[in-house]
């Protein structure tokens, strides 16, 4: 997890025009979170789930911030919505540990990302919710949020 230790995932940025600051996830952190969720969603769509609980040691992040799983196996035998829910619960814990390892204080998580983690940890996820998980607003890069906001205001 050297990437997480060398690159802060939770950053403090100024509010333009004021002396105030707020906490947000770096764009690479949101990309990592979305990539890991997309991997799970892809495997679940194929009717497969993780055969063992996901751990921090199962996540590999390259020097450029690309993320993937390592030393994990997926199985179709016994696939159920409960297995899908378990995979996302474990992903939620792994994402929190990644942020902590990068020096981030969980108390400073932005509200949208906190809600995303709550969504992952809920025990009532349905298969249709996977679309909402991988496209959650907390996983959008800041430039996409600005574009949406500006186009909404001016058009």
PLM regions: where:
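Short amphipathic alpha-helical interface segments
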Residues: 23-27, 46, 108-112
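Conserved structural core of kinase catalytic domains
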Residues: 1-31
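C-lobe/activation-segment region of protein kinase-like
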Residues: 50, 62-132, 147, 151-155
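Well-ordered, non-membrane alpha-helical segments in soluble/globular domains
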Residues: 26-37, 87-93
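Catalytic-loop of the protein kinase fold
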Residues: 31-62, 66-71
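Phosphate/adenylate-binding glycine loop and adjacent helical scaffold
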Residues: 137
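Extended catalytic cores and adjacent scaffolds of nucleotide/polyanion-binding enzymes
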Residues: 144
């Amino acid at each position: 997890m050297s990437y997480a230790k060398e690159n802060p995932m939770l950053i403090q940025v100024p509010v333009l025009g004021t002396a105030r600051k707020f906490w947000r996830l770096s764009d690479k952190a949101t990309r990592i979170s979305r990539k890991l969720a997309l991997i799970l969603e892809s495997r679940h769509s194929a009717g497969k789930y993780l055969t063992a609980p996901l751990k921090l040691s199962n996540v590999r992040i390259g020097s450029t911030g690309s993320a993937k799983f390592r030393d994990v196996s997926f199985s179709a035998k016994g696939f159920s919505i409960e297995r899908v829910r378990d995979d996302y619960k474990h992903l939620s814990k792994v994402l929190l540990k990644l942020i902590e390892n990068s020096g981030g204080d969980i108390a400073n998580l932005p509200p949208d990302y906190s809600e995303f983690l709550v969504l992952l940890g809920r025990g009532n996820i349905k298969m249709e919710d996977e679309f909402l998980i991988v496209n959650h607003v907390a996983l959008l890069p800041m430039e996409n949020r600005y574009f949406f906001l500006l186009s909404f205001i001016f058009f």
